[in-house]
Amino acid sequence: MEESLLSIIVALDAKSQYDALKIVEQLDPTLCRVKVGKELFTHEGPSVVKKLQEENFEVFLDLKFHDIPNTTAQAVCAAADLGVWMVNVHASGGRKMMETCVERLKAGNYQTQLIAVTVLTSMGREDLKDIGLDIEPVEQVKRLAKLTKESGLDGVVCSAQEAKILRELIGQDFSLVTPGIRPEGSNADDQKRIVTPKQAMLDGSTHLVIGRPITNAENPTEMLKSILASIA
């Protein structure tokens, strides 16, 4: 499958394996990847990843590991053992944590992509101030994205508004995975920094994470095809 055809990652906003599989029944694994987050993975464990892989979907395991270097690296390698396409950590865990993860993945000859979360898309300046960072979100994103690149990871999660800045700052050989994507007319839900799929791709995003607009659609396949057409 060409990477360019798999720019959409469908977030499986489901509590059970049954519900997740019902969603993917209506999706085409040649047109998208899927994301398994904390709620679904905590309910169902590794079996849901295996079931999705049996349906030929590549899985982004979105667990945002954040711990001491050795513990985080062990968790990342455990995810890689599941054969997931991508896994992530929190960049705020620091350089040593991220470098240790990269070293362990290389030592194990894993092909799993490793990216980092910079600033959660639900956080604005006041939220950062509450945790002792008197800084605009975009400045913290830039700082953590540079650290992620220097640590040898494959990319970062960032909002579309930051994608253009990061592309200029870091260069082309770096994935920018963008949540907070909503097609025209969609509800913003709990994402503060949102943008349309077309604009996100124009701004430099390589992968778009889209959940409820697809999974809650009357016809998820048609919604996915509509989004793909909008960014073609």
Curated annotation (Swiss-Prot):
Q: How does it assemble?
A: Homodimer.
Q: Mind listing the UniProt keywords for this protein, alphabetically?
A: Decarboxylase, Lyase, Pyrimidine biosynthesis
Highest taxon, organism lineage: Bacteria
- As recorded in UniProt, its EC number(s) are 4.1.1.23
Catalysed reaction(s) here are: orotidine 5'-phosphate + H(+) = UMP + CO2
Q: Which NCBIfam families match?
A: PRK00230.1, pyrF
Q: Which GO terms describe its biological process?
A: 'de novo' pyrimidine nucleobase biosynthetic process; 'de novo' UMP biosynthetic process
Active site per the UniProt annotation: K64 (proton donor)
What name does this protein carry?
A: Orotidine 5'-phosphate decarboxylase
Kindly list the positions annotated as binding substrate: 13, 35, 62-71, 121, 182, 191, 211-212
Q: Which residues form a coiled coil?
A: none
Q: Which organism is it from?
A: Acinetobacter baumannii (strain AB0057)
Q: In which pathway does it act?
A: Pyrimidine metabolism; UMP biosynthesis via de novo pathway; UMP from orotate: step 2/2
Q: EC top class, in one word? A: lyase
Q: Which GO terms describe its molecular function?
A: orotidine-5'-phosphate decarboxylase activity
User: Pfam family example for this protein?
Assistant: OMPdecase
Please give the InterPro entries that the UniProt record associates with this protein: Aldolase_TIM (IPR013785), OMPdecase (IPR014732), OMPdecase_AS (IPR018089), OMPdecase_bac (IPR047596), OMPdeCOase_dom (IPR001754), RibuloseP-bd_barrel (IPR011060)
Q: Does the keyword GTP-binding apply?
A: no
Q: What does this protein do?
A: Catalyzes the decarboxylation of orotidine 5'-monophosphate (OMP) to uridine 5'-monophosphate (UMP).
**Family the UniProt entry places it in:** Belongs to the OMP decarboxylase family. Type 1 subfamily.
HAMAP family given in the database record: OMPdecase_type1_B (MF_01200_B)
Q: Name one GO cellular component term.
A: cytosol
Print the organism lineage.
Answer: Bacteria, Pseudomonadati, Pseudomonadota, Gammaproteobacteria, Moraxellales
Classification via CDD domains = OMP_decarboxylase_like
